[in-house]
From Swiss-Prot:
Coiled coil: none annotated. Gene3D superfamilies: Thymidylate synthase/dCMP hydroxymethylase domain. This is Thymidylate synthase. InterPro entries: Thymidate_synth/dCMP_Mease, Thymidate_synth/dCMP_Mease_dom, Thymidate_synth/dCMP_Mease_sf, Thymidylate_synthase, Thymidylate_synthase_AS. The gene is thyA. (6R)-5,10-methylene-5,6,7,8-tetrahydrofolate binds at residues 171, 265. Catalyzes the reductive methylation of 2'-deoxyuridine-5'-monophosphate (dUMP) to 2'-deoxythymidine-5'-monophosphate (dTMP) while utilizing 5,10-methylenetetrahydrofolate (mTHF) as the methyl donor and reductant in the reaction, yielding dihydrofolate (DHF) as a by-product. This enzymatic reaction provides an intracellular de novo source of dTMP, an essential precursor for DNA biosynthesis. DUMP binds at residues 21, 127-128, 168-171, 179, 209-211. Belongs to the thymidylate synthase family. Bacterial-type ThyA subfamily. Homodimer.
Length: 266
């Protein structure tokens, strides 16, 4: 995971100081990219601090449910969306709604995930295998517009899925470690349910930033030598991609340094 640490270091040392929506301020660069290869059951995961993998998996299952209410997250003691929910736990038409029930002008609903699985199975050479959460007609109704907003899936000649994610806004210290593992697991799930295998995860960032109140935490993380990537993720099979539960995911060999706490910029 040295490439992630190199990006942190670059933004810390070369990033321009910028005021932002939250009022905290950032150091940022625009347009960097990270690439991660899959090897067997290994998944890309940060070792220089602990990544809350239960939260990663529960959030992904929540997306796949098509939910926009934090009730499922709270039931599983995952509180990463609390700050943006209203008194009823609603977030507006965020990721789950767009992934599973994108509304057309005729009032029909499009299940992008089902379409992606079907296309991977039946037309893997397609250049139109795209997952999009940036619904411009509903952005104003979302309590937080999508940061990881769109990805394209491609299948290579060996039956390997390559996921290319575009993330318009990348909180490098808190958010991106989560996003890396989340889209790695999504790639594994899509591969499982389409008879393929996971090959590569590419992440292209728009505004890649470190919040000013994360600077000391980033320096601490950069002082740590990355541990060997030995983490394997085993996933029990299910009839379809939507029927998975948390207990299906078994993480083995994850070695990490202690947690580094930081405040989320809201």
């Amino acid at each position: 995971m040295q490439n992630y640490l190199d990006l942190l270091k670059k933004v810390l040392e070369e990033g321009e100081e910028t005021k932002d929506r939250t009022g905290v301020g950032t150091r940022r660069i625009f347009g960097p990219q990270l690439r991660f290869k899959f090897e067997g059951n290994k998944i890309p995961i940060i070792t220089t601090k602990r990544v809350f993998m239960k939260g990663v998996i529960i959030e992904l299952l929540w997306f796949l449910q098509g939910s926009t209410n934090i009730k499922f997250l709270l039931e599983n003691n995952v509180h990463i969306w609390d700050e943006w929910a209203d008194d009823m736990g609603e977030l507006g038409p965020v990721y789950g709604k767009q992934w599973r029930a994108w509304e057309t002008k005729e009032g029909n609903k499009i299940d992008q995930i089902s379409n992606i699985v079907n296309t991977l199975r039946n037309n893997p050479a397609s250049r139109r295998i795209i997952l999009n959460a940036w619904n411009v007609g509903e952005i104003d109704q979302m309590h937080l517009p999508p940061c990881h907003m769109m990805c394209q899936f491609s299948v290579n000649s060996k039956g390997g899925i390559i996921t290319h994610l575009y993330q318009r806004s990348a909180d490098l210290f808190l958010g991106v470690p989560f996003n890396i593992s989340s889209y790695a697991i999504l790639t594994r799930l899509l591969a499982m349910h389409s008879g393929l295998h996971a090959s590569e995860l590419i992440m292209t960032f728009g505004d890649a930033h470190i919040y000013n109140n994360h600077i000391e935490q980033v320096k601490l993380q950069l002082s740590r030598e990355p541990l060997e990537q030995t983490t394997e993720l085993f996933i029990d099979n299910r009839p379809n991609i939507f029927s998975h539960v948390y207990e299906d995911f078994k993480l083995e060999g994850y070695k990490y340094y202690p947690t580094i706490k930081a405040e989320v910029a809201v």
